[in-house]
Amino acid sequence: MKKTRTQPPGTPLFIGAAIAGLLHAAPSFYWMCGGMWLLDTVGPMAVKLQQEGNVPVRFLLAAVFIAKVTGALVPFIDHLRPPAHTWVRIVSWVGVLVLIGWGGYGTFAGWQRVVTGKASLDHPIIAGHTYLWSPLFLMWGLLLCGALFVSRARRQKVSAA
């Protein structure tokens, strides 16, 4: 008889959240290495700092990259080896609040400004935050929220055993 390995509940959502986080981290790495593509969607100050090529900016981008990769992978890796650590889940829930809050506000505010005519998607920074960066934060947060919610029952069952 062949044993089949089943995935812990929430695994597809954890994978989706990790992918969204890594997609958000990739441009930070690219910019850290000196790239300019899509930087105008972040803002003119980011473009100016990148053109100046200051070493502290590179270190800041490295820190942002490491934080995003850590935030993307640690909850997923912790989920795969039960029981999940309580501190990882607590920090992940805080991350969910930040990601959904920041991403939701940015997405909603961007669309609200475009719909009311206060801003135009012709401006790279408005388009970038309305179409790309904020929705990606929101998606990352929603996927992680779903993963943590679905996996909570498993955590309770493992703790009770």
Explain the meaning of each model-derived region.
Residues L23-G35, L97-R113:
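C-terminal TM-helix exit segments that contain a strictly Trp-centered aromatic cap at the helix terminus
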Residues P135-R155:
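Membrane-water interface at the C-terminal end of transmembrane alpha helices
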Residues K2-G10, V74-L97, R154-A161:
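Cytoplasmic juxtamembrane regions at transmembrane-helix boundaries
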Residues M1-H24:
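Cytosolic juxtamembrane helix and N-cap/initiation of the first transmembrane helix
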Residues L61-F76:
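Hydrophobic alpha-helical transmembrane segments
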Residues H24-F59:
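Hydrophobic transmembrane helix segments
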Residues F59, D122-W140:
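Individual transmembrane alpha-helices with interfacial aromatic-anchor signatures
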Residues P44-V47, V115-H129:
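Short, membrane-exposed interhelical loops at transmembrane-helix boundaries
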